[in-house]
């Protein structure tokens, strides 16, 4: 973590979405209160309804034959934010509602660091949890009783920064960086299409180029519940395709836990970390092993 930089005066939030309209509405409602006047760029991926709802700050992204273009959509949203003069880029997942200090803490952290990926804690809200109404700046924190950050990632005390983060823990649920750092990293690799791999790839790029992962205390986000599969069986084709992209670029397999679990279920066939073999299981080849 290097020396301080000038304080951002024109931050922008970038969100990519396909469906999840109610989640996006909660996010937009909270942003309007906790960060009034801050530009919110929404990238609608193959979602004409969303494109109509989000007004002038929407970027439309057509469908891709292999899946949702998550990496390309984030790049397009950031390009739009930079073109509009943003001096701090905040990527916020469509399922995430910003805590009352998220933007302020990212702006503070960016002023204290240079060449960094800034990541705040994310709390996964349990099923059935209602998203509370936003509170105006200076008011009580409506999420205080719900805050329980993901245990696999650091959650520093409010206002504290923890540099030297493990690049393998980088995720794009909630992250901030300057346009200069974004340009240095080159954005997300658009060879990744669909689910899995693009975040891990950017974490490796950052590490290779000496860009630190810094955990930002107090920059809380709250992930709204939606059903998921563990392991993500429905995304197996994306995972296989994107894992091959990652291995070609970096010489190793990503997402080893998922590959191992999906192989055990008979959904795909993976020969292990030292093997070249990774493919979807053939019809009739499935079954636990």
Please annotate each region the language model reported.
Residues 20-34:
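Short, well-formed alpha-helical segments that are part of the catalytic scaffolds
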Residues 64-81:
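Glycine-rich, basic loop-to-helix element that forms the pyrophosphate-binding segment
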Residues 86-97:
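Short beta-strand-to-loop acidic/aromatic patch adjacent to the donor-nucleotide binding site
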Residues 101-137:
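Conserved donor NDP-sugar-binding/catalytic core segment of glycosyltransferases
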Residues 121, 138-168:
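Short, flexible, basic/aromatic active-site loop/helix in glycosyltransferases
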Residues 169-177, 181-186, 192-219:
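A short, conserved alpha-helix in the catalytic core of glycosyltransferases
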Residues 216-232, 246:
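Active-site donor/metal-binding and catalytic loop motifs
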Residues 231-255:
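Catalytic core of nucleotide-sugar-dependent glycosyltransferases
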């Amino acid at each position: 973590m290097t020396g301080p930089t000038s304080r951002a005066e024109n931050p922008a939030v970038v969100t990519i979405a396909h469906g999840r309209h109610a989640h996006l509405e909660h996010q937009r409602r909270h942003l309007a209160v906790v960060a009034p006047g801050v530009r919110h760029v929404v990238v609608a991926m193959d979602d004409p309804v969303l494109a109509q709802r989000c007004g002038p700050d929407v970027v439309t992204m057509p469908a891709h034959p292999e899946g949702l273009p998550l990496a390309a959509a984030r790049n397009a949203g950031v390009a739009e934010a930079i073109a509009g003069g943003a001096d701090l880029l905040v990527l916020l997942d469509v399922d995430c509602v910003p805590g009352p200090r998220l933007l302020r803490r990212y702006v503070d952290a960016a002023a204290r660091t240079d060449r960094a990926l800034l990541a705040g804690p994310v709390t996964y809200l349990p099923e059935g949890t209602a998203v509370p109404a936003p509170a105006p700046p200076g008011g009580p924190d409506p999420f205080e009783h719900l805050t329980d950050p993901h245990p696999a990632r650091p959650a520093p005390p409010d206002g504290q920064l923890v540099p030297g983060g493990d690049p393998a823990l980088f995720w794009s649920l909630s992250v901030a960086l300057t346009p200069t750092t974004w340009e240095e990293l080159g954005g997300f690799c658009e060879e990744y299409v669909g689910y899995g791999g693009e975040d891990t790839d950017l974490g490796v790029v950052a590490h290779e180029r000496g860009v630190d992962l810094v955990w930002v205390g107090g920059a809380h986000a709250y992930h709204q519940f939606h059903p998921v599969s563990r392991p993500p069986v429905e995304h197996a084709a994306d995972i296989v395709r994107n894992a091959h992209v990652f291995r070609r670029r970096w010489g190793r397999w990503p997402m080893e836990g998922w590959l191992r679990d999906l192989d055990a279920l008979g959904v795909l066939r993976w020969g292990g970390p030292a093997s070249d073999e990774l493919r979807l299981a053939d019809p009739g080849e499935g079954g636990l092993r």
